[in-house]
């Protein structure tokens, strides 16, 4: 089966999976099926994930959903947008929210916490305690896990943590909502162009709201490219919101900074920087 046909079938009546408020934001825009490379084929039994609401593919977390990022958060309440690239490449890990790893029930090592997520959780520990033992030097992650084991440090499980942030208005959204195989042809010739109109409308809407402070977070060049490609700054400038109620937070990717740039946690407080940016445009800090 062609990838394009499979995506059209998967996304039939896709608005059923989002709230009326988000549906209104996305009024008049559709996934761009015509932009999906017609030469891309799915192998027999190959799965596109995450799935539709209530229809998680085998091995996926039951609540995982293509539109999970939009659950339990009203468009007017978004105050931070954490931009990711695409879903995790394993069905058990992809939830529909950027950076969230779906196969984890704790942070103690099984399954293995992805390197990017390790550093985000280290940033959470720093934001909560101010203790750089959890971020600096060899063995910082091991020190964090050791304190979790003894109860000296408490960090909620992945789903609870992301649910709590989402309830505070933090939108963890990817530039690409679906995935089927680790192959750039499928990623950039199939899934990315499919979702481009949806992502552009969503981000431009958030950038253009009057009186609604929001910080867009770009950790890494690809996240920044996604925001720039959607025209976030241009939309905010046109609406008169740029540097007034809309701002951008840039930083290295949690996993691999570009050559010559410092790592994600090097001398930085990434989540504190987000709260400072939100405060500059009149928003309330996030309880990380």
Question: Language model features by range: what are they?
Answer:
Residues 2-215, 221-228, 234, 256-259, ...:
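A polyanion-binding, active-site-adjacent surface
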Residues 280-288:
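Charged phosphate-binding loop/patch that engages nucleotide di/tri-phosphates or the phosphate backbone
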Residues 216-219, 249-251:
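Conserved active-site loop/cleft motifs that coordinate metal ions or position small ligands
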Residues 237-281:
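Short, flexible loop segments at boundaries between secondary-structure elements
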